[in-house]
Amino acid sequence: MHWSERRERFRSVIEGDRCVHPGSVFDPISARIAEELGFEVGMFAGSVASQTVLGAPDLIVLSLSEFADQAYRICRAGNLALLVDADHGYGNALNVRRTVEELETAGVAALTIEDTELPQSYGTVGGTRLISIEEGVGKMKAALDGRQDPSLVIAGRTSAMDITGPEDTVARIKAYEAVGVDAVFLSGVTNTDQLAVVSDAVNIPIFLGGAASALGDLDALSAAGVRICLQGHQPFQAAVKATYNTLKALRDGTPPSEITTTAPKDMMKRLTREDDHRKWMQDWLGGELAERD
């Protein structure tokens, strides 16, 4: 796989002059759908990974290898430039370096490393705490050192705006910019004053973990230096509901022929690359793929 090309495409997005919404993806099929629909960037979140791979909530119980394996499955399925949420880097600065190595090998175009104290330690359940700026800087340095392909984008992430306020947020993102991260990712920015403080503080692209309506439309976000703005992870949630409703209908006695919300055959053939597989069968096995229901 030629991962560098999609990383360069991701860089062209964040070095451009407009903000985009990434398509939230969770497996090979969803990634192909996002690519087919024209999303410039895909997003694979840690919370969605935990739900998809383990059926567990976002409590940092997913391992690095489990996350990297699923990221690789997504990357190899198509040509979508994938941004992944690498949480806290699965440990200290040494673990962060290893995390970058594994995710780069998996083919991701960009990743975020955050300065939240994770996983939650004994006696701190119910609250969110941040590591020190000094430890955060160490993690960012380790992430950058672990990168082999210079086109891989590394973003320093913080939730400080929602925890310790604007002043600490600025101190953190300026410190991360100073050591060389390519972008900063912020959660908890809810109004234009907060966004202006952030925008004035750094000269690198800004990613937002969701934008409140008070922040304005894509044009307003673009003008403030935001280049990636998440919209949530509705595709996986919708898939869960659709699966639940379909199974319930079948369990309740609805004949399969009356289930009308399934993907049509031509869509499934397209998304599973059936034509490619038919050609390979002809070229290499001397036969054709039989039609199946």
Tell me what each language-model feature is.
Residues 2-248, 282-293:
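Alpha/beta enzyme core
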Residues 250-293:
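Flexible C-terminal active-site loop/helix
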